[in-house]
Amino acid sequence: MAADIILKYFPDLTETQQRQFDMLDTLYRDWNAKINVISRKDIDQLYEHHVLHSLAIAKIIRFRPGTRILDFGTGGGFPGIPLAILFPECQFKLIDGTGKKIRVAQEVANAIGLKNCEPEHLRGEDEKGKFDFVVSRAVMPLPDLVKIVRKNISKTQQNALPNGVISLKGGDLQAELRPFYKIVESTDISTFFKEEWFKEKHIIYLPI
């Protein structure tokens, strides 16, 4: 199974979750041939570079049932779709300013039977809803992201981790994180996933 790498790090998946993860390979290959949401050279690394990378967020927080999460700039559905599979009792809204990409996310979510995932063609500035967490993957510098999504963070807490932004990023982030140095937390993904690709990849958490 292509999704064996997911099972390696998340051994407690249900049969439904395993099936949903397995279906992603064919679905993303088919859609990527029509609408480019993953670079052509990277599609063979879908599970490691996109699905497992998205699930790194689950290594720093187990979202409680009923948690509302906004995936800002989801592209073709990352990190939102893998997280929605892993946390079926949470609600995910996936937004992106590019309609073609959101169509892919919607079609994939429909095909695997995700009921807790709402993709919408929308710019972040226009999102009015309230969420416990905003997640993103290499969308924009953290200070810019925070300016846009601060309005969307709910004041009501229901998780062990205070509400805020969780962002997947790579490389040297010192300058980007400096404005938040007193409260931001950076975790190396290589702490959890041993594949070479995850070196210099980080989970950035900022309570808001």
Model feature map: region roles:
Residues 157-172:
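Conserved beta-strand signature within the Rossmann-like core of class I S-adenosyl-L-methionine
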Residues 120-122, 149, 168, 174:
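Non-DNA-binding regulatory cores of transcription-related proteins
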Residues 55-139, 146:
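Conserved SAM/SAH cofactor-binding pocket of Class I
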Residues 1-70, 100-117:
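Class I SAM-dependent transferase core
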Residues 91, 116-118, 164, 185-188:
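Conserved beta-strand segments of alpha/beta enzyme cores
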Residues 170-208:
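Active-site capping/gating segments
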Residues 138-141, 173:
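Short glycine-rich anion-binding loops that position phosphate/pyrophosphate groups of nucleotides
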Residues 142-153:
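A short, conserved alpha-helix within the catalytic core of class I
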